Amino acid sequence: GNRMELMFRDEETASRKHTDQTLAELLKRHRACVSDLVPPELIAAYPGEQSVFLRMALSCLADADHTDTAAAYKQAPEQEQMPPLRAEERLAALDRYVSALGGDDARSELRRQMYAACRDAKITDGFAACDSPVGSGKTTAVMAHLLEQACKRNARRIFVVLPYTSIIRQSVDIYRKALVLPGETPEDVVAELHSRADFEDIETRYLTALWRAPIVVTTAVAFFETLSSHNPAALRRLHELPGSLIFVDEAHSALPIRLLPLAWHWMNVLADEWSCYWVLACGSLVRYWELQPLSGLSMPQPEIAELVRPDLQRELSRYESSRITFRWREKPIGRKELPKWVQEAPGPRLLILNTVQSAAVIAADMAAEFGQTHVEHLSTALTPEDRGNTIDRIRRRLADPEQLGRGLLQF
């Protein structure tokens, strides 16, 4: 909405030109105003990236100010103590969860290899990449790697940064099943932070918004906006980031291309100076940091190791490409013909359309053609609760041999 447009307003040439022309004068005035409060020699003494250092200091100040004010008006939680990360214990719990999934088929074996490869990867630098296809088990495999790294790095917390709110719920459900230890409250251990998240009480909402939980699952927009936000609600949680491990899924599409150079600079500073560790992942990862606009920047270019060895990557990709068949038509097709063309393919089938309106219309057409019980409609036009119910229903149908045997499952 308007907030996003303002956040990225430097896309306008006139705005950038005006900033370039006035920035030196604005900095001069700023330094004149604060020189008595913060002596220039004190700032100059910091050996690293001063802009990030000052934002961290401002974050601490903003959080302290808001926390004290809330306490004075008795609006702060009575207990702010969140569970510690307890990485070694959670890794053992995750190992048990994954081993219990079982399965003797080829896909299960590949997923076990993927899990072991990520968990046991020996990475000592600030970055790693995980390039493996959808369905290979990245949700648990990368978490195992992060927990193993947390033990070695004495990390404070883990962030899981996902591109869409629609897939956050699925990941949160898995993490809460696999990582919560006896006596803990799931919402306190794995925090779900996005615009559609529901909270059991106001205290949980408050502490989740401040990134106090040991594991935080959030959207790319909410995460990266925090790094640059002037809004106190976001700024005050920034100081919780140092010493953290961050898993960015769909890494190359997490931000608009024009913002990647600045974000990449921040990520390097956080890795080099603030003990952060980044795992950049995707089903088909574009190594954007090797492109000229980023590789040409005057900053150290880190060596980014792969969590998964090349032969396992190829095997996973080969299996997934044989498991899922993509079909398309070069020539346009009418509404009446589309359901019949889809029906020609063996089930289960997933039909993806370009708008929520088209999805609703075609779902109705297919329901009229094959019956309501054989069609599932899933889009952001549905409420979050209805989407969750639909996804649960799809899972049950996929697990039902009778449904698959009839080959009529379509959504």
Residue ranges and their predicted role:
Residues 124-146:
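Walker A/P-loop
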